């Protein structure tokens, strides 16, 4: 893993990032799990899956709609890429033994998130024309793409820059760690150590838990939770699986294709909070995240924290006794000031852009003014007759679960009332990171504490009172009840849960329903996105088609034992998908049932309900 990188290798890297082959949707071809071979679960091509027809309450299915229907909107949903800096001191992989609450602190495929996102972008681009035909054989062009949150994993500046490059296109450099300088110090390092760290940074070498030579002398058990692809050393399923040079290869630049459509961004909890849960400053994480000291697995026993909540675990890390143990497990790594947490204003500005094509530039002037620039919800109509509304469901007071604060709830209610009062109301599709069942945080935004010049990030920038906060299903004035009051709402499209799931929410008076569509993540199996198309069947019903989309990387991954130093970015993405597969015999619930993947979701056309 200590191979030097030359200009020749950079050129080779760029040449190997070739355009992806045409990517079939899962309606034409699926990926199925095969047997394990040489320690890796094999992935095989399988037959496509037809769209399962599902009806909301009160819908009569009439034959012949395929010859009558008209496309109203065709768009792609990408969710939960979790682009991450796997070398960051803020990753805290040493907590891997703390149980379920810390289970996402390490994944064997986590160094490959930028390549997976690029591979997914390539797949979306291959579907610029719909595979579904409307009346007269017409096929719609892709109107836009939407990212429903958790583009980054740890709310870091460098992670945000990486996903922006993946979505916009151009040369993407996924390595972190910069040479030591007066502006990027490593206090206490000897001249020899400074020289070693600077060489590692300049040569884009990986430093972290997946290179066991980076923390020699640790107790033998400390290495077993973390797969080292150079040696194949690890406990469990990837023991003896080798891909020499993989971790260094993952740090090398490649050419990202970039989306060919406008794309709109929805806020997720990992985009704004460390580990997706920490909204306030943390005594340990904030001090070490940009510096040159990383806590590696060692004498600290994370099993002592098993059974605790994630919040309790992170609180305990600031205790004097725990800090003393953690200091003894620290090793030097190249520092990087770009590992700092982004402020919400910075995040908004990155996505606003002069053309406002990424959504956050579409926040209304009144909401901008009242929120002091903190509002991150907006509405737009790229096609006549359909209104899209993007919500910010991040519970800024902390925690992984979402809510809708009261100012946003009032704005949404006003948007829906205004639409309902039109002579011909537009159909409404809601986008959010959290699905309704994930909106149950009762924590107010004020828990973060106010922003100040000395504290521009990890603070409550909105001067308005957030309470009462609104849940998805329970409590007073839940979001479901608000959406059901307006028949024009036909769908809510979300992510967060890392699994495919579809369910209807019907109105008690029988006046239609709306569909909740939840799509899997890019970081965990099956690493899918979704193509969505809203159709007017011209018989009093609408169809929302959802088609699961695999990313463009080859289905079979490179063979175990192959030298990874010359892998293309698509081969890296293919290997990521294979590494993310569930254990043999374990459930694959993240794929969902047949009725959660490729679906035709029928609902009564609210424009024809009358009065």
What name fits each language-model region?
Residues 25-136, 143-146, 187-247, 254, ...:
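Metal-dependent phosphoesterase/phosphodiesterase active-site architecture
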Residues 81-83, 431-437, 490-502:
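Histidine-centered catalytic micro-motifs
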Residues 145-146, 154, 159-166, 171, ...:
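Catalytic cores of eukaryotic secretory-pathway lumenal/extracellular enzymes that build
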Residues 149-150, 268-270, 392-393, 431-435, ...:
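Short, well-ordered beta-to-alpha junction loops that form the rim of enzyme active sites
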Residues 258-262, 488, 512:
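Short, proline-enriched alpha-helix->beta-strand connector loops that line the catalytic pocket
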Residues 419-440:
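Short acidic, glycine-rich surface-loop motifs adjacent to enzyme active sites
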């Amino acid at each position: 893993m200590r191979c030097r990188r030359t200009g020749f290798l950079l050129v080779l890297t760029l040449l190997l990032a070739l355009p992806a082959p045409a990517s079939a949707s899962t309606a034409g071809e699926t990926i199925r799990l095969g047997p394990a071979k040489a320690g890796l679960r094999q992935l095989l091509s399988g037959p496509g899956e037809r769209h399962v027809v599902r009806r909301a309450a009160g819908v009569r299915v009439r034959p012949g709609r395929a010859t009558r229907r008209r496309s109203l909107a065709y768009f792609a949903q990408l969710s939960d890429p979790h682009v991450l800096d796997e070398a960051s001191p803020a990753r805290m992989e040493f907590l891997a033994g703390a149980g379920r609450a810390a289970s996402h602190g390490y994944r064997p495929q986590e160094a490959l998130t930028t390549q997976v996102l690029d591979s997914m972008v390539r797949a979306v681009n291959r579907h610029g024309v719909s595979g579904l035909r409307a009346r007269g054989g017409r096929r719609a062009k892709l109107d836009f793409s939407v990212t429903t949150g958790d583009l980054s994993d740890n709310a870091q500046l460098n992670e945000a820059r990486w996903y922006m490059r993946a979505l916009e296109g151009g040369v993407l450099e996924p390595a972190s760690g910069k040479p030591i300088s007066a502006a990027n110090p490593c206090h206490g390092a000897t001249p020899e150590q400074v020289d070693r760290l600077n060489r590692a940074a300049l040569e884009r070498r990986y430093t972290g838990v997946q290179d066991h030579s980076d923390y020699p002398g640790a107790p033998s058990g400390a290495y077993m939770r973390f797969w080292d692809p150079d040696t194949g050393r690890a406990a469990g399923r990837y023991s003896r699986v080798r891909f020499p040079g993989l971790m260094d290869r993952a740090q090398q630049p490649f050419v990202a294709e970039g989306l060919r459509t406008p794309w709109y961004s929805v806020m997720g909890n990992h985009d704004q909070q460390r580990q997706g849960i920490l909204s306030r400053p943390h005594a340990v994480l904030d001090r070490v995240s940009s510096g040159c000291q990383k806590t590696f697995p060692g004498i600290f026993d994370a099993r002592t924290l098993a059974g605790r909540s994630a919040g309790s675990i992170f609180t305990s890390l600031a205790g004097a006794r725990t800090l003393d143990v953690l200091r003894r497990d620290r090793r030097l790594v190249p520092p990087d000031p770009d590992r700092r947490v982004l402020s919400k204003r910075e995040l908004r500005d990155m996505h606003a852009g002069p053309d406002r094509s990424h959504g956050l530039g579409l926040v209304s002037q009144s909401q901008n003014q009242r929120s002091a620039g903190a509002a991150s919800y907006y509405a737009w109509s790229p096609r006549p007759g359909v209104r899209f509304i993007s919500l910010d469901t991040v519970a800024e007071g902390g925690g992984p679960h979402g809510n809708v604060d009261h100012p946003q709830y009032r704005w949404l209610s006003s948007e829906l009332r205004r639409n309902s009062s039109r002579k011909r109301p537009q159909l409404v599709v809601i986008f959010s990171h959290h699905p309704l069942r994930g909106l149950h945080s009762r924590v107010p935004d004020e828990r973060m504490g106010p922003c100040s010049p000395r504290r521009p990030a990890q603070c409550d920038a909105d001067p308005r009172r957030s309470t009462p906060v609104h849940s998805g299903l329970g409590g007073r004035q839940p979001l479901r009840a608000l959406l059901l009051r307006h028949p024009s709402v036909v769908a809510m499209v979300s992510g967060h849960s890392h699994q495919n799931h579809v369910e209807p929410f019907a109105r008690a008076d029988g006046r239609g329903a709306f569909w909740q569509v939840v799509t899997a993540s890019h970081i965990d199996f099956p690493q899918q996105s979704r193509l969505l198309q809203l159709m007017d069947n011209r018989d009093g019903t609408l169809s929302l088609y959802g088609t699961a989309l695999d990313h463009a990387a080859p289905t079979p991954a490179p063979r175990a034992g192959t030298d990874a130093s010359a892998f293309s970015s698509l081969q890296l993405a293919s290997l990521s998908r294979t590494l993310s597969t569930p254990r043999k015999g374990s459930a694959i619930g993240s794929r969902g049932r047949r009725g959660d993947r490729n679906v035709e979701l029928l609902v009564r056309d609210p424009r024809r309900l009358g009065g």
